Amino acid sequence: MSKVSEKQQNKRTNILDAAYELFIEKSFNNTSIDDVVKSAGIAKGTFYLYFKDKHDLMERIIIRKSALILRYVLEELMKKKETCKMTFSEQMLFITEKIVDYLEEHTEIITLMGKNFSSCLNYFSTIEDDELKSMLSELVHENIENGFSEQETLKRIYLIVTLVGSVCYDSFVFESPFKISEIKPLLFKSVE
């Protein structure tokens, strides 16, 4: 990466980090672009070099955070698979459990993301994390070897991630219609 590219990436990351902290602290609606640029220590025009508006910024934060969570979960899955062979169903249950555990420990993330946890899958081609792409690709290809098509596998992963994200959002943010302790057994059974 060239010095200019690295500097631009650092500036973009700085804006994302500053906005994330402000959105957590003050909420999305109560944070202005002026708040973000002040916190990031940049000029307002610089903000618009990287993002169209506050909604674009929020979308990028959600993609980034959901990709980070997914990466963590898939890294844990890869470690587990080193010690034992797992079916696709077992892998999906493991992923579900890890996502629930992670979001339970970091409820501020799901509060901010809402029911948009699967965003990183919607924008998979824009994710800059090659290792995450590689782990997802490995998961997909393992399932292809078990007789499922690539599209069917991607759809299954999407459905599971969307289901888990939505259930976690309702359970952690509203504790309604069910607390996570009440719904988790049925969630796992649904994924299975």
Model region roles, listed by residue range:
Residues 94-123, 169-173:
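Amphipathic alpha-helical segments used for helix-helix packing
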Residues 111-114, 143-189:
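Hydrophobic/aromatic-rich alpha-helical bundle segments in the mid-to-C-terminal region
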Residues 67, 71, 102, 120-147, ...:
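Amphipathic alpha-helical packing segments from all-alpha helical-bundle domains
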Residues 41-51:
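Short hydrophobic/aromatic patch on the recognition helix
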Residues 38, 52-53, 63:
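Residue-level detection of the helix-turn-helix DNA-binding "recognition helix"
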Residues 60, 75-104, 160:
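Hydrophobic alpha-helical connector segments
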Residues 1-26, 30-39, 56:
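Basic, helix-initiating cap at the start of DNA-binding domains
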Residues 58-65, 72, 113:
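Alpha-helical DNA-contacting segments of helix-turn-helix folds
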